[in-house]
Design a protein with these regions (language model features):
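Repeat-based scaffolding regions
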Residues: 1-28, 34-46, 57-60, 73-77, ...
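Extended non-membrane alpha-helical scaffolds
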Residues: 29-36, 51-209
Length: 209
């Protein structure tokens, strides 16, 4: 399908969206390696075309770099991706939860925890606001992680529950292991060992399928 799309004449927006699809495909199938760099390049292409989509893609790039860790390609470490993403244009309208997460995460990796803490708290609080079912899986797991980092146990519980419910509703099987992991952690922290064990068993079943 990508090859067919490339065969025809493409506008700048269509070309940028094609690169984004390619980058997200690599991210979904490899969870590391080239994904952060491809997403970063796609975000840069989108900057002059669609700022909201560019910022969402920068957030995807930061998330991919976090996930990839040492497996990220040269030039796409979490610090390097965050530094580029921090220079992204501001959102064109009122900042949405993914915008606030992007600002908080880039501050965390470029300026440190103390500078990022107010931004991360704001992002976690805003994450209670629903956006779109298609968009939320891209950032909701990060909101769960950040809720634990800022010691917001109530929202950690709420967001992890919403994340796994959303993934189940969408039938997004590729996202289910990550959603289960995000849900297991607050359950363990709260001492709900039986519920956590049940989800761990489900994780094994999904991964073996």
């Amino acid at each position: 399908l990508l090859a067919m799309a490339e065969a025809g004449p493409l506008s700048d927006l269509e070309q940028a969206r094609l690169e984004l699809v390619r980058a997200r495909l690599v991210s979904a199938t490899s969870r590391g390696g080239d994904a952060p760099l491809l997403l970063l390049r796609a975000a840069q292409q989108l900057e002059g075309i669609d700022i909201s989509l560019a910022r969402a893609t920068y957030l995807d790039a930061v998330a991919a770099a976090i996930y990839a860790g040492r497996l990220a390609s040269p030039g796409a470490s979490t610090m390097e991706v965050a530094r580029v993403a921090a220079a992204a244009p501001p959102p064109p309208n009122r900042p949405r939860p993914p915008d606030l997460l992007l600002d908080g995460l880039t501050a965390l990796f470029t300026r440190g925890y103390t500078a990022a803490l107010p931004l991360l708290r704001q992002a976690v609080a805003a994450a209670e606001e629903s956006t779109s079912a298609d968009e939320e899986p891209h950032w909701l797991w990060l909101a769960c992680v950040m809720a634990s980092h800022v010691w917001d146990d109530e929202r950690w519980e709420l967001l992890s529950r919403r994340y796994i419910q959303l993934v189940r509703q969408l039938g997004a099987l590729s996202e289910l292991p990550l959603a289960l992991d995000r849900r297991i952690r607050p359950l363990l922290f709260a001492g709900e060992l039986t519920a956590a064990a049940a989800l761990l068993d489900e994780t094994r079943t999904v991964e073996d399928a």
